[in-house]
A protein has these predicted regions:
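Glycine-rich oxoanion-binding loops at beta->alpha junctions
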Residues: 2, 48-103, 109, 142-149, ...
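N-terminal phosphate-binding or glycine-rich loops at protein starts, especially the Walker A/P-loop
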Residues: 2-49
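Short, ordered loop/turn segments at secondary-structure junctions
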Residues: 13-16, 41-47, 76-77, 106-108, ...
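A glycine- and small-aliphatic-rich helix-loop capping segment at beta-alpha/alpha-beta transitions
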Residues: 25-34, 54-60, 115-125, 142-146, ...
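Flexible, glycine/charged-enriched surface loops at secondary-structure junctions
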Residues: 36-42, 161-168, 219-222, 248-256, ...
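Accessory alpha-helical/coil subdomains and C-terminal extensions
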Residues: 103-105, 111, 115, 120, ...
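C-terminal non-catalytic interaction/assembly regions of soluble proteins
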Residues: 240-328
Length: 328
């Protein structure tokens, strides 16, 4: 494989996700395999502006495939949104001999990469890393599978105490704009009800569902709630509302928060990261740019960055039906 590209930079940007380190490892080792150099860029786009670079080789990524977070760190950069900031970043890349970029992150990170690439005609490739699984052009993003396993493990433990005390637990999970975590983890954990941004269940229907569960003989219940659900109340306000209207329920709240982003990545995320990293580097070496590598129909595929940024993921309607049936 011949290419004008001799050195590739890799960075992580936006919210961290399990599997990012595995993706960094894959990018670095694929570069080494093709006998080109790789440079780690610390703290995302801010590190590009400040020239915070470090040469990376196969041994520098030993024993990170199992690590959560990102060894390259991540940071927001308002300066990168300015012409001056982008010019500084470009000048540093040129000074460092970097010919192309692999950006691991979400749609915000991809927006920055797309604009930068268009401004300076600089080759970029994106790898989707976010636990929310809300990026168009891939069935799975890095970290989603691990986050699901983390959430299910937490809910299983919550179920133990809920059953012991005949309580209703409202479990809030991440997902401001997308309910993929809530829906999949809710089904996997046997939740009695699931609230997501894509569906407006309504307070009346929620109360009816809880009353039905109680009448059917269920002594405890779990409601999984995406943080961006359309119910119109915070999870704590919802608790008060339920206790006011259904006083027979002893209701508790558990907000899982940032623990969903942490932890050792699952086998699926490690393999996914390895596959996407290889494809990202080899696509750049083939002369491709402004694409995101993702999974479509269980195959690694390229989606134009602009589509990944502007497209919208859809909830699997069949999962909604399965959830409804399983709550019987």
């Amino acid at each position: 494989m011949t290419s004008k590209i001799k050195k590739i930079g890799v960075l992580t940007s936006g919210g961290d996700a399990p599997g990012m380190n595995a993706a960094i490892r894959s990018v670095v080792r694929t570069c080494a395999y093709h006998k080109i150099e790789c440079v780690g860029i610390y703290r995302g786009y801010q590190g590009m502006i400040e020239g915070d670079f470090k040469e990376m080789g196969p041994r520098s990524v030993n024993n990170i495939i199992n690590k959560g977070g990102t060894i390259l760190k991540s940071a927001r950069s308002s300066e990168f949104r300015t012409d001056e900031g982008q010019q500084k970043a470009y000048d540093n890349l040129v000074a460092g001999g970097i010919d192309a970029l692999v950006v691991i992150g979400g749609d915000g990170s991809f927006s920055g990469a797309q604009f930068f690439s268009n401004s300076f005609n600089f080759p970029v490739m994106g790898i989707p890393g976010t636990i929310d699984n809300d990026i168009f052009g891939t069935s799975h993003t890095l970290g989603f599978d691990t986050a699901l396993n983390t959430v299910i493990d937490c809910i299983d433990k919550i179920r133990d105490t809920a059953s012991s005390h005949n309580r209703l637990f409202l479990v809030e999970v991440m997902g401001r704009d997308a309910g993929h975590i809530a829906l999949n983890a809710g089904i996997g954990a046997g939740a009695e009800e699931i609230l997501i941004p894509e569906e407006d269940l309504g307070l009346k229907r929620l109360l009816e569902s809880l009353e039905k569960s109680k009448a059917s003989g269920k002594s405890s219940s779990i409601v999984v709630i995406a943080e961006g659900d359309k119910i119109g109340k915070t999870v704590f306000e919802l608790k008060d509302y339920i206790e006011e209207n259904l006083p027979e329920y002893d209701t508790r709240v558990s907000v899982l928060g940032h623990m969903q982003r942490g932890g050792s990545p699952s086998c699926y995320d490690r393999v996914l990261a390895s596959r996407l990293g290889v494809k990202a580097v080899e696509s750049l070496l083939e002369g491709k740019s402004n694409f995101m590598v993702g999974m479509i129909n269980d195959k690694v595929a390229l989606t134009p960055l602009i589509q990944a940024i502007k497209g919208h993921t859809q909830i699997d309607r069949e999962l909604l039906r399965v959830s409804d049936i399983m709550s019987t």
